[in-house]
Structures are given as structure tokens and as C-alpha cells.
UniProtKB/Swiss-Prot annotation:
One of its GO terms (molecular function) is 1-phosphatidylinositol-3-kinase regulator activity. Regulatory subunit of the PI3K gamma complex. Required for recruitment of the catalytic subunit to the plasma membrane via interaction with beta-gamma G protein dimers. Required for G protein-mediated activation of PIK3CG. Keywords: Cell membrane, Cytoplasm, Membrane, Nucleus. Residues 315-336 have a biased composition (Acidic residues). This is Phosphoinositide 3-kinase regulatory subunit 5. It comes from Xenopus laevis (African clawed frog). Coiled coil: none annotated. The lineage of its organism: Eukaryota, Metazoa, Chordata, Craniata, Vertebrata. GO terms for cellular component: cytoplasm; membrane; nucleus; phosphatidylinositol 3-kinase complex; phosphatidylinositol 3-kinase complex, class IB; plasma membrane. InterPro entries: PIK3R5/6. Residues 570-589 have a biased composition (Polar residues). Greatly activated by G gamma proteins. It is a peripheral membrane protein. Pfam families: PI3K_1B_p101.
Amino acid sequence: MQNTSCTEDRIQHALERCLHGLSGSTDISSNWTAGLCLNYWSLEELVNRDATNYIILAEKTLARTREAQKNGEYELLTPLALMFYFAVLRAPYIPETSDLLPKAFEVFHTFLTWPAPYCHVYQEMLSFISEEQKAPGITYQRLVRTEQGIPTRSSCSSTATVLLVNPAELPSEFLSVAEQLSNAEQPIQQTLVSLIQHLFQASLGTHAHTEELGASLKSRPIEKLQEIYSDLTEAMEHATMADIKPGKKRESLKAKLLEVAEKAGLMQGNTGSSLTSRIQPIFMPVAKCYTYSWDQDDFDILNQILLSESHLESLEDDVTEEDEEVDFEEVDDKDEDGGKSPKQDSVFSNSYVYWNFPSDSKEDPSMSMSNLASHSMTFVSSLSSCVDSGYVEDSDEGSQEISEIGEYQEERANNKLKQKICQLFKTKGHQAKDKLKAELSPCISHPLLSPFPDISKTIPLRRAGSMYTPQLSRIPVRSKRSKSLPQPAFGTQFLDLQLSQKVAFKRRPFLSCDDDTKVSTLRIVVFGSDRISGKVARAYSNLRLKESSCPLLTRFFKLQFYYIPVKRSSSSTNAPMTNAESPLKSPSPSGRFPLQDVFGDEASTNDISHYIGILDPWYKRNIMGLMDLSTSMLCQSSKEENETTETTTMPILADMVLYYCRFATRSLLLQLYRAEITFDSGGKQTEVFIQCLELGHSADLRAIRASGPGCKRLGIDGDQDVIPFTLQIVYSKSTVSGRSRWSNGEKVCTSVSLRKACNTYEELDSKMECLNLTVREVVKRQNSKTKKSFNQICTSHIKIDKAQIIAQHGGTFPLCLDQDERKILQRVIKCEVSPCYKPEDRDFCRRNRRPSWSQASQNQSEFCSLLCLPIATFCGAQP
């Protein structure tokens, strides 16, 4: 038997507790799952106590992976990979003599032949291990650098996390945790010192002398720290790209780091190991977060990120200065050559934050340059009607050019000096706002630009040049006319031209996971029940429509959506809560809350989170499992307030939110459904839902509940007492073969509901995804002695994929989407429900649809792309 220490035994026990119940062979009662979601958080707290614990956890995880592979415990493979990734990511130092990474590479390499998602997960793990062998700690550096928005010479990527909360539905403790995350940003100087300490320690170990290094760095100004960190980052990035053996790469990296340290006067010749030096754990800072109150069917509030994010400055100061120094010389060279050599404007450089031209290897660079040239020539020629004639005699051209070159140099020097002076007295927020006003001119109709109605007037006057038009060469100096002549003005013709040329810029596809051209990532974290998930679905659909006509958010950001289920607070519904101390309580295995009225209708459900949890057990354990804990436990910190630590201690909920955002990298696509609604007035409206659509009495009940205390005087009748109505229900049932069978009939009923079928694993097949049609039919209506009618109800359940519901005999019915009291539509006479397709493909589908609605093309999904909501998960879709 192998001798182990007490710490190793505790880590092994904590690891087994994290994996307990994830295997399909283990059956856990729902009554005993309350504390399972805290197992991983407890493991992190245990490992963070000492720097050597990370390597112990990595070794234990690797051994458990071999055992899971041998025993066929496939459900454990992705959680084990995530825990190994965490251990190596947070390890302050892995000795060169350690065989941990080579062994892991050998073990993980066998999973490349496995089906998805295992092959994708371990392919990323192999890339991660390979980079860590070449440049230790580079993944940690990239993660923290992007979360804090720290630019370098080689990279200016950033990641912003947005927390969308609804104060009417969330407990006050949750709101305080969200505010705590937003206010946890630490000073940039402290972050740079921590990153430099981690960088040296990951490569040099005890030779880095972390404490002395930190004391030396704290006395340096921020500008000097940024310069040092940029040099160190370039050395690490170069080490990952150099084509030499990993061992030699690490030695070369050490030499480069020591060279930078000696140049900056950090080590001062003290690079040896001492008895007092030891590996210090480097705590990861809290990601930069923004908290907004949100309860709308759109994401317009996200446009505020464009104004608040500091990384939206055009370029770093050092890069801008280098470009400005060589710009005029290059312009003169181009003018002497007659403008034949293409010159790209500095705004469109590859390192610029906003714009990314197609640079993939698949695209022809000559074609892209020719397109840019044609656009530039078109733009210049189109401005001919707006530019003054500027007649100049040929005899004066030479002398005028020489004199104007000198004037141009003098103006450039003066403008540069003015810009430097202005930057000294301007805050970052003012700089970002000014640049945003000048650079976002094409999207005048976008809601973000409503505070700037005269934005076109703020565009600086410039000859034949624009922030939005690729420019191959500057107009010759002689085109600069006399100052007495009228100056050109950019009118509607300029704006129309820019809108027509937006296809020249590369924009990230919505559901693409392979295109990494965006330098900025926007994490969108939403909290709530199925009602909030429905709002996210409608907001996502509206976002696609807006961005397809005038891209703004998707032009700058790669969007990632995160969903944390929370039960609706008692203040948002009229019914009391089940447990006053557990607003997230959900003991039922189906994810539905036991809160029901006397007629059996759920006031709030969490079916979407249950759907995700079935496909991703690690999400179910660590994110959905939070609903089993009380608010007081979720909002408490791991340490008391009077204890001093290097970083701010965060509540358990905050730690798990950050863990979810950092480690959930694979998207799960949730099908959206479209409801085409016709009113009795003849008007039509199209809505989107994701979980349920209710018609009739159940929709009326939600409207009555939403009235608050007034619902008592309105009175609530059950299905047995209400007046029924007649509906014509036409629905399609899909089979395994892909054929559809249509049924048509009239029903006298009180309520009809369409719910996403997501309660069992068999219902999650993408080819068989369907809706549950529930009809409460009145089979007999009796009159009692009190002259009050009494309905005998028969409830039927049918699995469908499309449906059409039409009111008969001149009647109407109410309709409610995703349990949202604000989305109750009255006086509806017809409702068509079908899967939602992408806007660009819907017209094609309608053109190819047969005249009869019930005889739609059976292979429609083969020609039209379905519109799905991407939710970030740990494992992704299971095979």
C-alpha cells in the first residue's frame, strides 16, 4: 500500500465526493442532494490553502481518469478533465523534473478517437498541456489579462462579464452579491504586480524570490509596470510559437525573462535559491463585472458596455506613438510612387480593437486587397459632388506641393502635441465616449446613439478619408485647397454609402464556435426561472434582427450566454413560497416547483435548467444544484470579515458564478419556437418562446395573479366553473422516420398549453425534439341546483412539433408566453406554432411552402437553419 500524507487523503476524499452520483450506475434520491453542489467549492477551498496542493490534485485527477476509462465511467471524464485543468491552471509552479504533464498528455491522447464531446474536450486539454510545457503559466496569464482588460503590444483582447438581474424576482441577498462582484475590481497596479510575480514564479520557481520581487514592483509607476509586463508577455507568446523542443523552449524563455528582469532592475543579480524562499500561491483576481437591472425583451442595455469598457480605446499608447512616427514618412513614399503601393489606415490595423478584416488562410489576400481598393476608389469618386472645385494652375503645382508639405509637417506636430496635452487632462471615460461618438457614425438609427442625435456633425473633416472606408493611399497634397474655399460636409450621401459598405467588414457568426477573430468577449449571465429564460430567448431573437441590419454588439464582441436558475421571489407572484429560507428550493427531480394553485397550474418552473442538467451532469451538480441551498448559505463567505487576506473573500454564490463563466466553454443550443398570432381586429404579431405557451383559462389566471392583492376581489374560478370555448386544433406529430402525420379536430376546452418536452432523456433527441400539447377538454357540462354550470374535465397529452389553434363561432382567447404576465395577449383568434428559423432563411422557407398550411414540406428543416439559443455549459451536448 502506498503511503500518503493526511493532506493527500483529504484531497482524494474531496475528489471522490465531487464525482459521487455523477455515474449512471449510482442512483441518488433527490432528498439527499442538498449539499452535493458544495463538494467542488469545498475542494477548491482545500486546495487553495497551500501551493503544493494543486500538483497533488492534478496527480489524483489523472489517476482517477485512468480508472474511469478502465471501468467505462464515461460521465466522469469531462468533470475530471475540468478539475485537472483547474489544478494545472492555478498551480504556481510545476518543476521541470515532474512528469505530470507528459503523463497527462499520454493519457488524454487516447480520447481523440472518442465521439463528441469527449474528443473535443480532450483536444483542448492537449493544446493546453502543450502550451504549458512551452511557457508555464501562459493560460493563467491570458485569462487574467483578458478579464482585467490589460492590453499588451501583441494582444488587446478583453472579457467583460455582465450580470442581468431583476430586483422584483431575486432575493435582496442575491442583489447584494451581484453588487459585490461589480465593486470587486482591484487597482491596475496590484493586478500587474500579481501577474508579474506569477509569471516569474511559474518559470523560475523558488529562484524568483516572489516577496522581494513584489516589493520591488510596488515602488514602480504604472507606466513602467505596463512596459515590463508587455516585454514579459511577448517573451511568453514567442516561446509558444517557436519551433524547438519544449525543454529548450523553457530554457530560452528563462533566459529571456532574466534578460527583461535585469534590464528593468528587478532581480539585481539575486537569481539563486535560498532556504527562506518558497513557492507562494498567487490568488486569481475577481473578473471585471457589470450589474444591470433587466426585465425587457431586448438587450439594448448591453450597449452601455461600449461606453463603459476601457478597452475600447483605439490603440495602446506605445503602439499609437510608433504608428504616428512612421506614418508621415510612409505617406510621402506613397505619394512619390504615385499611390500605387497599398497603404492601410492605422485604424484598420490588425491590432485595432474594433475592426478585423478577413485574414484567414482560406481567403485570398489579393482578392481582399482588391476589394478594399475598389471600395476606396468608389468612396473617393462619390465625394466629388461634395468637394469644391479647387482650380489650381499647373505652373503653381510644384511650389504649392513643397510649401504644403512643410505646412502639413508643422500641422501634424502641433496636432500631436495638442492630443498629448488633451490626453493628460482627459479621463478614460471621456476618451472612450469621444472615440465612440466619432467611430460609430453608420448606425445612426441604433438605440445606443440616441443621446447623440447630431453624431454626423461631430465627425472630423478629412479629405477623402473616413474612419469607415479602407484607404489604400492618402490623397496627394495638392488636393488640399485654399482655406478661403468652402469646406466639404458629410451629409446623407456619406452615411448611405457607409451603410452600403458594411459588408466589407468581417462579422462573427452568431452560433460559430471556431471563428476567433473577435478580440473582445461579452459574458451575459442571467438569473431567473423559465420566465427569464423566455425573455432571454426573445431578446436574442430581437438582437439577431437588429444586428443583421446594423451590427453593433456583434461587431465588437463575441457573445456568450450563461443561465443560472433561480426560483421567482414571493414578491413577484401572489402565492407564498415553499421555504422562506430557500428561495431556490427545487426538490422535485423534474425541476418543477411544488408551488401550485388548487387547479394544478405551476406558478413558476425551471424546466430549461432541468433540460440543460440532463445533458450536462456537471452543470446540474454545480449550477442547478445551487437551488437546493438556502440563501444564507449561498451568500456567506469562506472566511470571517476580520481575517486579512491578499484578496477580497467572495460569497459562495459569487465563487460559483465565476467558476461557471471561466470553465463553461461549450455551448448547448436550445430550440426556439415561433408563434404567429392573429387578432380579431385583423392585426398580426409574431412572438418567440422557449418553454411554454398557454391559452385560455390558464393565461387568464396569470393575468389575475399579476394584479397582486386585487386578485382576491376579482375571484379565481377553476376549470370546472369557467365558461368553455370551442377551438379548432390542427397539429403535426413527427415520427422516427422523419414523416409528419397531421390531425385536425374541434375541441370544447377551458385551457390549452404547449410545453417543451424536456423531462426525460429520451425526449432530448434533436431529431425527435417536440412540444407537449395539453388540452383540458370539457366532456360534459352540467347545471347544478344553484344554477351554476359545472364542467367535467378530461386532460389529454400529445407530443407534437407544429400546431395551429383557431377560435370557432366568433370567439377569442387570451395567450401567455413563458409564464410572463407581461406577455399576455388578449382577443386572439388564431395562433400558429412552429420551430423558429433564422431570419435570413425564413423567407426561403415560406417561398417553398405548399399553399396548404397542414401540408408543409416534411424536409423543411433540411433546407432552413433553425434558430437556437446558445447557453454555455461544461460538457456540451452528449452523444
